[in-house]
């Protein structure tokens, strides 16, 4: 679907988009002894009121990947697959200029995407110490570009992994 002249994806993302880098803890309660796994995750998200879901569908069509979900009064477009993020989302925003604050956030996030893509399929315990420390630093540095920065969860555990790698 060709992009309409009246939709500016970079402007929408500059206002309502999120380049998310997080360290996650996942516990598998259904498995014996409920093992816990830690991992770095990136995602690209744009949210809007439910009435604007068509705009998010158009963004999905233009970018060429991701999913649009509608829950309650909110629509959410997200790309979570690392291959789609590295191969499609990052190149798209290198070609389409974001507002200054969002551009700085994107550049940090894109560095994180490279590190995670490079280590795809590897256990976190086998990552190089430098890569883990780089992601921790990127996460800390990007907080100043967030509208509502959150305290990162499990960061101490991520730092512990950097000491064993």
Explain the meaning of each model-derived region.
Residues 1-165:
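Sequence-level preference for short, compositionally simple segments enriched
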């Amino acid at each position: 679907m060709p992009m309409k002249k009246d939709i500016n994806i970079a402007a929408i993302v500059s206002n309502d988009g999120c380049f998310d880098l997080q360290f996650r803890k996942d516990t598998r309660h259904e498995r014996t002894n409920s093992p816990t796994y830690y991992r770095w995750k990136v995602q690209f998200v744009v949210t809007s009121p439910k009435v604007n879901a068509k705009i998010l569908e158009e963004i999905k069509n233009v970018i060429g990947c991701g999913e649009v979900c509608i829950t309650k009064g909110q629509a959410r477009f997200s790309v979570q697959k690392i291959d789609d993020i590295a191969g499609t989302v990052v190149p798209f925003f290198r070609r389409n200029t974001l507002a200054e604050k969002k551009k700085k956030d994107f550049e940090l996030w894109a560095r994180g995407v490279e590190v995670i893509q490079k280590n795809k399929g590897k256990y976190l315990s086998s990552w190089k110490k430098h890569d883990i420390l780089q992601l921790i630093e990127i996460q800390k540095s990007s907080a100043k570009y967030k509208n509502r920065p959150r305290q990162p969860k499990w960061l101490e555990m991520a730092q512990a992994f950097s000491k064993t790698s």
